[in-house]
A protein has these predicted regions:
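Soluble metallo-hydrolase cores and metallopeptidase-like ectodomains found primarily
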Residues: 53-54, 161-198, 203, 291-395, ...
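Catalytic-core environment of secreted peptidases
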Residues: 64-110, 145-148, 190, 203-205, ...
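Metal-dependent peptidase/peptidase-like ectodomains
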Residues: 157-158, 172, 288-289, 295-316, ...
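Intrinsically disordered, low-complexity terminal tails/loops enriched in metal-binding residues
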Residues: 585-630
Length: 630
């Protein structure tokens, strides 16, 4: 559906929300009356059996998790009316209120910390936190020579020119400094090319200076790499994320800022002015967010015209330098003569978003202070009015599936509790916001403001994308789920998952998966035993086509039932999953969690934001029972 049709839906949202509440209320009443267990399954409330000791009891409640109920929830949550649920937007806040209303209807207690005078308000379930845009409200870049301004450029959501535009980095800090030309900004000894080694050999420091680098890598006319890569395919140095170049820059020093020269090439789409206009439009949307100020220096894309003005005092030009490097494959680096770059920025104010937390108190007086946390993120990518056709990213698989699964899990646990089989340990459900912005909701909760003390958090179970299929699984082999853990930290969780799958007759192939960036990372960083369920990166990943109709609801129900059995086992077994003994560990510094950008090998002496990819740094421990990268 196009954006023009979205604005008419506010009244319809409220109507559909009311109908959804009525549907769920009716469904709950019907299934509650049908879920009374036979007498032979009765037991004292504080002695609820585990899945391994009485699998028949667990199966009874598993079967209340149905494809129909999951579909009913997902077709609503991932509809156009929520406008893609982008963090901080109206759609995300409507989704948060929907989730809170569902938890209230199911009988779960609120566990948020939002200030409210009405304990029955949906906000009682909210954990609000502040995020910041990674683009400035306005930026100005000036080129100074002998104290006079020789060129200037202004960029904002309303204004742009053909000289520069803001790309990334610290969107609040002003910066002034000289200029160092660092070639392509590549440091790759395996490929035999290292601009920063060439600077060091000349005794040139980048500290406190603007570093000018060329986009991409040395390219042939057909767009292939001139570097000795396999089959001359492009290397990571040409990635649009700039992750490799940012990592090399941070390892080389502490520059004042970065000037990325974008020139006409086989990889550049449109003119520089076209790209500046697109960046200006993008700045009007929410865009990338952070929990605070970025520690990476401000980075601007600059045109060849502006770059040549900066290099004029040195008697050099971009095309001349690029030609020399491409022909010789040897770095051309130098400190520019008689020129200073000065920038000033105006920052947007903070924006608020919310995690949603709901709580089931444990039934065992000895164990109820211990908590099993079940998580999924409910935000997605929002909408993009510049697209032709469908402009809404509905996020059905990512992570509408995990979100509706948490509601069904909550309902199944509450049914069991009303029948006298409440979990011995407490269970906390958290639906995180801003996962798509860099797992910000879970980082805020686990690293800054855990509303249940982490020492009482015995395990975390995360679901992210559990209803679609990745390209590795053709139609005949789609009865699978990826199980992700981390060595000894997750060993007992994964074993419990395997045992309950067999005992409760769930027909799923368990496949070991890689540790995708998702909300489990920050619980892992706090050394909390965890398990993460996913069906991988689907064909429609981060596309408007990620719609409810693409989901296999029978498969989603099987995965959700498996998660329920695992959570039941952990919540009711006598011993909590064995965790790493913190007293045996040494804090070595802080690293980026495994984000896929390759920046998790750099160790910092401070907490905060990864200057390369923007994720929140986590503690790095060494010692007994923990690997070097935890």
């Amino acid at each position: 559906m196009k954006l023009t049709n979205v604005s008419k839906g506010t009244t319809r949202v409220l109507l559909i929300a009311a109908l959804a509440l009525l549907f769920c209320s009716t469904l709950l009443d019907i299934t509650q009356s049908a879920a009374t267990p036979p007498a032979e399954l009765e037991c004292p409330a504080d002695q609820t059996p585990t899945a391994t000791s009485q699998p028949a009891l667990v199966e009874r409640y598993q079967q209340t998790i149905t494809p129909e109920a999951l579909a009913a929830r997902l077709y609503f949550l991932a509809s156009d009316f929520f406008e893609g649920r982008e963090a901080t937007t109206r759609g995300q806040k409507l989704a948060a209120e929907y989730l809170a209303s569902q938890y209230r209807q199911l009988g779960l207690a609120p566990k948020g910390n939002a200030k409210t005078t009405d304990p029955l308000s949906p906000s009682a379930y909210f954990q609000p936190f502040t995020v910041y845009k990674r683009t400035p409200k306005q930026s100005r870049l000036e080129v100074l020579s002998q104290g006079s301004t020789v060129a200037s450029s202004t960029f904002s959501a309303e204004t742009h020119d053909d000289l520069s535009y803001f790309l990334t980095g610290n969107a609040a800090a002003a910066a002034t400094g000289g200029v160092v030309f660092a070639g392509y900004g590549i440091a790759d000894d395996q490929l035999g090319y290292n601009d920063y080694a060439a600077l060091a050999a000349k005794g040139i420091s980048i500290n406190g200076k603007w570093v000018m680098i060329l986009a991409d890598e040395p390219l042939a006319a057909d767009g292939t790499s001139l570097l000795p890569t396999a089959d001359h395919k492009l290397s990571p140095w040409s990635a649009l994320s700039l992750a490799a170049k940012r990592k090399a820059l941070i390892e080389a020093g502490k520059p004042a800022g970065v000037l990325l020269v974008r020139y006409a090439s086989p990889r550049m789409q449109g003119t520089f002015a076209d790209n500046a206009a697109q960046a200006s439009l993008a700045a009007q949307r929410v865009g990338p967010l952070s929990l605070g100020q970025s520690t990476f220096p401000p980075t601007y894309a600059v045109s060849v015209k502006l770059a040549d003005q900066i290099l004029a005092q040195s008697g050099r030009s971009v095309e001349e330098l690029r030609r020399q490097i491409n022909q010789s494959l040897k770095p051309q680096v130098f400190e520019a003569n008689g020129v200073t770059v000065r920038t000033s920025l105006e920052q947007f104010g903070g924006l608020e978003t919310e995690n949603v937390l709901a709580f089931i108190e444990g039934s065992d007086p000895r164990l109820k202070d211990e908590v099993v946390v079940i998580t999924a993120h409910y935000d997605h990518l929002g909408l993009n009015p510049t697209l032709k056709g469908d402009q809404i990213f509905n996020g059905a698989a990512d992570d509408g599936t995990g979100t509706v699964a948490t509601l069904e899990l909550a309902q199944a646990f509450m049914r069991a509790k009303r029948d006298g089989h409440g979990p011995r340990r407490s269970v906390l459900f958290i639906n995180f916001s801003a996962e798509e912005k860099g797992t910000l909701g879970s980082a805020h909760y686990a690293l800054r403001e855990p509303l249940v003390p982490l020492e009482r958090t015995v395990a975390e179970i995360n679901m992210d994308g559990v209803g679609g299929f990745d390209p590795k699984h053709p139609a005949k082999s789609r009865n699978y789920v990826y199980i992700v853990g981390s060595g000894d930290l997750s060993k007992e969780m994964i074993e419990a998952n395997r045992r309950v799958k067999e005992l409760t007759n769930i027909n799923l192939e368990l496949t070991e998966g890689q540790n995708f960036p998702s909300d489990q990372l920050y619980f892992q960083a706090q050394l909390i035993p965890f398990i993460y369920y996913s069906t991988g990166l689907i064909e429609h990943y981060h596309q408007p086509s990620d719609e409810p109709a693409t989901i296999d609801y029978e498969h989603l129900a099987r995965v959700t039932r498996l998660v329920f059995a695992t959570a039941w086992q952990v919540a009711n077994q006598d011993a909590r999953p064995r965790a790493v003994d913190r007293s045996q560990l040494k804090l070595d510094g802080y690293v980026c969690p495994p984000c896929g950008a390759g920046c998790d090998t750099v160790v910092y002496d401070h907490a905060g934001e990864c200057p390369v990819c923007g994720m929140i740094l986590v503690p790095k421990y060494s010692g007994a029972g923990v690997s070097a990268r935890r």
